[in-house]
Amino acid sequence: MSPGEAPAAAGTYPAELECDVLLLDGRSARLRAIRPEDAPTLRAFGAKLSTETVYFRFFSPRRSIGDEEIAHYVTVDYFDRLALVAVVDGELVAVARYDRCTDSPPGARAGGDAASGQGMDDAEVAFVVRDDHQGRGLGTVLLEHLASAAVQRGIGRFVADVLPENYRMINVFRSVGFDEHALLDSGVIRVTMELASRPEYIERVEGRDWTAAVRSIEHILRPASIAVVSAGSQDGSVGADIVRNLLSGGYTGAVLPVDPQAESVCGLSSYASLSDVPGPIDLAVITVARRLLSDVVRACGSKGVGGLVVVSSGASDDEAQSESSDRDLVELARNFGMRLVGPECMGVINTCPEIRMNASVAQRPPPPGRVAFSSQSGGLGIALLGEMGARGLGVSSFVSLGNKADVSGNDLLRFWEADAQTDVIVVYLESFGNPRKFSRIARRVARKKPIVAMKSARTASGRRGAYSQGAGTVPDEAIDALFRQAGVIRVGTLEELLQVTGLLASQPLPAGRAVAIVGNAGGCGVLTADACESYGLEVTELSPRTQQRLAEAVSRGVATSNPIDLADSATANEYRRVLEIVLEDEAVDALVVTFTPPGPEGAEEIAQAVAEAASSATKPVLANFIVTDGTLSALRSGPRRVPWFAYPESAARALARVAPYAEWVGRSEGIVPSFDDLDVGAAREIVTEALAGQAGPFEVVPAATTARSVWLDTASAFKLLEAYGIPILPWVRVSSATEAVDGARSVGFPVALKLDAPVLVHKSDVGGVRVNLGSADEVAAAAEALLTRFGPGVSLVVQPMGPEGVETVVGLVEDPSFGPLVMFGFGGKQAELLRDQMWSLVPMTTQDVRELVSGLRSSPLLTGYRGSALVDLSGLGEVLSRVARLAEDIPEVAEMSLNPVVASADGAVALDARVRVETVLHEPPLLRRAMRTA
């Protein structure tokens, strides 16, 4: 069990285990620990079990579960004995439990290692699911959550006995990761599962989570029937508008208006209540007044509705009240197994020919296409839909997320990955709920389909506005790191969002950054070339063969170097032929075509030539036509649309956003390195002792509070690094001049003498550092001066002088939303001034490390810039990887700064370290927690 990790004490009800989970059919269930008052419910549960299910659970036929057994099952201490129950629609439908084996060594009490499972206890485990709920994944998800709770309580392995003919239970155990070990003499099969996190176990959990999320969204985006609640009979009412949009859009399913005040809506008979609707309802779109929401959601649950889209406002303008009301609404929906979009959303759209659903307030939805779009801002989302339609950019589906109380961007990303109608995904975000989960999901999805994201609130004023709208704030550097690692294309403006999306939706990805430019005005070509270079693209040299072919193709003679100027007399045929030749040049990865009127032929004729040349190209073609209107129908028709840009800078910028994504897709993801020399136990002991000790000079939060935050003294910080194999200069901690001299002799002259004061960012600023001390007399004098200046009781640290090399800084910060963030930059006294830094989320792959090291403005200093010495990049990368691993293993490390880390040809070594630790409450491992959104 990790230091600082404190599950509920034995006998105390563990409220932290309560959560909502998604099942394989897309519905949800509530999980919680069993309580003594569950005895009547458990008795009713047992009465509904079939004879076969009872036999398989208890290995003997019986008619019912006795009162003594019931009392035993509901009486647990939540530590050595724990049971979780699943509740659906107020009824207990499944139970899973463990009992710690009495003959196991007391691993948890001895400080077992949860990461490896060593020194942990065994526990017997069993579960049973009510017959009418079997096959929904309840047993699997209960075991996953029970395993998570068990690890936190010092359990390292589950053991279970199963009858050979109980193939369903055996399959559930196998799906979770149990291994069959033996057929016992009693005729039962013994299965076991190690609870230490294993890649295959995490992969199984993610796979089940993925399937459940996709199926849950199908109720919302692929419904066979839709009830519009409070449809209203008057024109202009939101409900009536949605009914009208469903009908006018040709929705292929049943439209069911529900309004007690209306006899008919848009020519359809209206039902007085949901219970009056004959047949099943897949989706309910709710537009009632806020005060009626809970009653309507409850009625939907009783009817068995699959999903909800809540257009109504969830609460008042008070943010705290709104969040509380949203939580209550979601909890009510989850009690009936329903997913919920909203509240305060603008609806959902699916243009798939088999669905044709416009269950939104959008009067003019975009045409069918291959772009999926979600927006946290309802009004902005509807406006962008209209602009997409005006640009001829088709949409596969659209979801207005509103308050994002339940269904989130994470759910939609997983659905759209599997959606055959979607090629490009666009998300507009105002806040993150679970950014680490978003990162995991986006990294997988972006390998198959590009994700274009706009995250608002980048500036201080923007963050104030986001807060007033209920959107959370996180460091913008962290968001950049998240998007970069996950392959998400981040854009800064709405115009850029539309332009990049249009490029991705119509053109192939570039193979590199080499751009060719063809136009009929030299000035425009130069502007385009400048823009390309400024955005990190390369205006490439054309091959001699291409230049020869160009000279032959245009008889009047043109400049055949890149950018190519065809002059203002260029005809459509000349454009077409030149474009075809340039696109065949292997040195060219992308082509930007410019046109400036007037010319012998109009813009439409030139556009037709561009469209024809681009129709069979395997490289992206972008068109910059400086014309008074943007109709250019030729660019929008034909087998492949050509994206049009009003200005050359816009075309260059859009291409520059896409090129890094193409590189990301084409390179290896890398691996998360493993290390077999870590002393995790020693590291945890250092942290535990610091947090359990008496308040000292390095205490940040008063010890009277429930949480503690403490700066490690220098010796403890150095020992923590040593436990994780992070190179640190030899050191000796001393408290007198005599000890300082002895320490200097042991590490070797010349030495540095430093004040042991980790709360100080730069000890040199207060005169706390002496360097290049070459003799015992110099060391003694420096030590006396420091001890006199800073008073009795202080300690000093003696180290040899560091090697020559490049000073870098490696940092670590535990962000409450993003988790651990690793920072790399150029260090020393100038670190804050230069601000040449990059951030990365953990876990970090080898590719993430390479990008950190090579992505800084000053990175050439590491690779021999202007004759400087080469640096051992692998050694520097290993330091970063080890820091990332420490961040994963020891989440109590809230802040760390290794400044400087000197990188040289011989490797990388830290000269100093500041480490702050704090008590934390750990979130359980990877689990299906539907209430945690992003």
Language model segments and positions:
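Long, contiguous binding/interaction regions
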Residues: 2-219, 934
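Catalytic-core regions of core metabolic enzymes
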Residues: 198-934
